[in-house]
Regions:
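Rossmann-fold NAD(P)-binding glycine/threonine-rich loop
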Residues: 70-113
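Hydrophobic residues within alpha-helices
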Residues: 15-16, 87, 131
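Rossmann-like NAD(P)-binding element
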Residues: 33-65, 69-74
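NAD(P)+-binding Rossmann beta1-loop-alpha1 motif at the extreme N-terminus of oxidoreductases
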Residues: 1-34
Length: 181
């Protein structure tokens, strides 16, 4: 799959590395922008308040499936029901919300886990399968929460996950049926 990641920080750079390792063709764009025209999917991995500024420097977004990995720290654009909806305003195509609840500092510790950690996502129909594949290829177990109308709930879970950190250390999360662990 051809992926353009907008944002080269801990999340964007880390996901780009995981997907390259899984065999995807990945281009990571930084503050200088760049084009998304050759991508099959665009992943937005910038601070939530920077979505508009970051995406306005990237031509070729219209019609691209997008995965929003942003968080609303320290604030969100209240003109949209979720940050994922703000991303959709730039692409006009199916969007998913994911990867905002997976700590980037743990990316290099995914593979050694006995079972893959979970990754929540909310997605529109046209983005659901692609997002599930990207989650799996990053080493996580996809945990679907429904359509894009659930994106705000995924965003708001960030506060709960931060509160669940063990002695200030980031955590993996996993949902399993009895006997799976």
């Amino acid at each position: 799959m051809s992926i353009v990641v907008i944002g080269r920080g801990n999340v964007g750079g880390g996901l780009a590395a995981l997907w390259r390792k899984a065999g995807h063709e990945v281009t990571a764009l930084g503050r200088g922008g760049g084009a998304a025209s050759g991508a099959g999917v665009v992943v937005v991995a910038v601070p939530g308040p920077a979505i508009s500024a970051a995406l306005s420097t990237v031509p070729g977004l219209v019609g691209k499936i997008a995965v929003d990995a942003t968080n609303a720290f320290p604030s969100r654009n209240e003109a949209f029901p979720s940050l994922a909806e703000e991303v959709k305003s730039f692409t006009g195509a199916p969007v998913a919300k994911s990867f905002n609840l997976n700590f980037a500092v743990l990316y290099d510790q995914i593979a050694p886990q006995r079972v893959p950690p979970g990754s929540f996502y909310a997605a529109e129909d046209g983005a659901r399968d692609v997002t599930g594949e990207l989650i799996t290829d990053a080493g996580y177990d996809p945990v679907p929460l429904g359509g894009l109308d659930r994106a705000r709930a995924v965003e708001d879970l960030a506060w709960a996950l931060i509160a669940a950190m063990k002695d200030g250390a980031p955590v993996f999360y996993r949902f399993a049926v009895p006997g799976e662990l």
